[in-house]
Amino acid sequence: MLNTQRAQEIAASPIMANVTYQEVPIYIQHVDEQNETARIYPLDNPELEQDVPLSQLMEH
């Protein structure tokens, strides 16, 4: 599970972090602190953007 601060660090970093959503590698585009969600997309499908709870993201 990612906390808000770590998710923001990952989103701002130029270095790709190993983060998954439902076991799928994803890229974090934006973090919404108020709602504790992140806008993400799967690395293999950039068109599939979605907002998901930070609690469902895993850093490996």
Swiss-Prot record:
Main location: other
Source taxon at top rank: Bacteria
Pfam families named in the record: SspH
Record GO biological process: asexual sporulation; sporulation resulting in formation of a cellular spore
InterPro entries xref list: SASP_SspH
Keywords noted in UniProt: Sporulation
GO annotations of cellular component type: endospore-forming forespore
Keyword Methyltransferase included in the entry's annotation: no
Locations listed in the record: Spore core
Family, per entry: Belongs to the SspH family.
Official protein name in the record: Small, acid-soluble spore protein H
